[in-house]
Amino acid sequence: MMLRGNLKQVRIEKNPARLRALESAAGEGDPAALALALPGEPPVPAAPAGEDRPADEGGFTIDIKSFLKPGEKTYTQRCRLFVGNLPTDITEDDFKRLFERYGEPSEVFINRDRGFGFIRLESRTLAEIAKAELDGTILKSRPLRIRFATHGAALTVKNLSPVVSNELLEQAFSQFGPVEKAVVVVDDRGRATGKGFVEFAAKPPARKALERCGDGAFLLTTTPRPVIVEPMEQFDDEDGLPEKLMQKTQQYHKEREQPPRFAQPGTFEFEYASRWKALDEMEKQQREQVDRNIREAKEKLEAEMEAARHEHQLMLMRQDLMRRQEELRRLEELRNQELQKRKQIQLRHEEEHRRREEEMIRHREQEELRRQQEGFKPNYMENREQEMRMGDMGPRGAINMGDAFSPAPAGNQGPPAMMGMNMNNRGTIPGPPMGPGPAMGPEGAANMGTPMMPDNGAVHNDRFPQGPPSQMGSPMGSRTGSETPQAPMSGVGPVSGGPGGFGRGSQGANFEGPNKRRRY
């Protein structure tokens, strides 16, 4: 984030002569030199726009934006400075004015009792410049000691895979909190060493990552190779230990009695120096042996892990295959059940259709029967035709039809007595004579019985009445009373189509049969 300090033009003094004069005057207590370092001194006036300053002044104008590297984050823990040997009466405003030439600070902390403080600048470069210029500066008779503050939220990550990069490392540890920097350490050839470090913006995320990775197994890649997370060891490999910071103790003076030298062979110094070197060589060999054993164990573990992973993949494939087969079997069962259900539904529909058809047929028959019983009355011809069809079969297949009172004779036998009547419709009881019966057909033809209905109301007294012979449906005889004569029905006569050996008899022919009755 670029703040307004990035747009601020600052002037940094780079005059070595003035710095040397300042250092020499610090020991003599020169007021001018001390005033130069006081925070209350007036700022160095900047050159007006368009005006060139002389080159011998030793100052130059810089832009703070030029001190930010591409992609560098601002106000990180790496931009934090430790300022020691502060005066006990320094205020926070005086402390800020001391660093106001290096941009706008974001964190200011002062411990007046112990005489130290912390300040965080915008970029690492500006912090390095401030450290180089202000370290050793005299402030109220005290030389300032400025160092980069220890990064308390930095972690060391070991056992990294060769395919892990800076971006992957940062992405992996971002789940614990904001990460300021993540670096995978490489050798001089650019090959990964399996180590790296991660710097968080605050301590709580670092503690969380340390606890989570210590309790569980944090994997960064497909290979089940967990990372080892430890607190980062802080080393000052830039400033080191200067002579002015050495404590002049008795041990210090004793060790400094002789200058650096080479031990002469055969002397006491050379003997023990050789023993120290042998101890170091033994340590080196043991470390190499330990490293070799660890490397072999890692290779063996990787081989076993690869074989186990292959077997695990095969097991997963088998399980997946079994699961698919089970799913196919279940789908097949569902399909069979669906087909069975459809078949049952189809059979049920067919049964219902058949039952509906039977119900319709039964209903139609009942309706027909009801209609016959209620509204249908058969005529005489239909009754006679039914009687002819339901009659007994005579010789040679002739049908012998008769009425309920005079059944027809079979063959060449004479007509049977019909309720005491003879062939000439004469009864054995006294009374008026009946008219002649129907004419005899040929042999095998239907011999119809005497009709029961009278022809008219006239009473015939003669035995053989005049007029045409009576037809089927003609009156059986004369009755008392007058009745309206009925018209003869057409088409009624002897049944034709009988077998050909029977001739057609005449109406008035005498029947000579065994059952012939005597005439009186």
From Swiss-Prot:
GO cellular component: cytoplasm; nuclear matrix; nuclear speck; nucleolus; nucleus
InterPro entries from the UniProt entry: NOPS, Nucleotide-bd_a/b_plait_sf, PSP1_RRM1, RBD_domain_sf, RRM_dom
Gly residues bias (residue ranges): 494-506
Coiled coil start-end: 280-374
Gene Ontology molecular function, alphabetical: RNA binding
Keywords: Acetylation, Activator, Biological rhythms, Coiled coil, Cytoplasm, Immunity, Innate immunity, Methylation, Nucleus, Phosphoprotein, Repeat, Repressor, RNA-binding, Transcription, Transcription regulation
Record text on subunit structure and interactions: Forms heterodimers with NONO; this involves formation of a coiled coil domain by helices from both proteins. Found in a RNP complex with CAT2 transcribed nuclear RNA (CTN-RNA). Interaction with NONO is required for its targeting to paraspeckles and perinucleolar caps. Interacts with SFPQ. Part of the HDP-RNP complex composed of at least HEXIM1, PRKDC, XRCC5, XRCC6, paraspeckle proteins (SFPQ, NONO, PSPC1, RBM14, and MATR3) and NEAT1 RNA. Interacts with ALKBH5 (when acetylated); interaction with acetylated ALKBH5 facilitates recognition of N(6)-methyladenosine (m6A) RNAs.
Region listing for Disordered, in residue ranges: 457-520
Residue numbers spanned by region Sufficient for perinucleolar caps localization and interaction with NONO: 228-355
Classification via SUPFAM superfamilies: RNA-binding domain, RBD
GO BP annotations, alphabetical order: innate immune response; negative regulation of DNA-templated transcription; regulation of circadian rhythm; regulation of DNA-templated transcription; rhythmic process
Compositional bias of kind Polar residues: 469-487
Chain positions found as N-acetylmethionine: M1
Domain RRM, chain residue ranges per copy: 79-151, 153-234
Principal cellular location given in the protein's record: nucleus
Name of one Pfam family that matches: RRM_1
Name this protein carries in UniProt: Paraspeckle component 1
Family recorded in the similarity comment: Belongs to the PSPC family.
The organism of origin for this protein: Bos taurus
Function, in words: RNA-binding protein required for the formation of nuclear paraspeckles. Binds to poly(A), poly(G) and poly(U) RNA homopolymers. Regulates, cooperatively with NONO and SFPQ, androgen receptor-mediated gene transcription activity in Sertoli cell line. Regulates the circadian clock by repressing the transcriptional activator activity of the CLOCK-BMAL1 heterodimer.
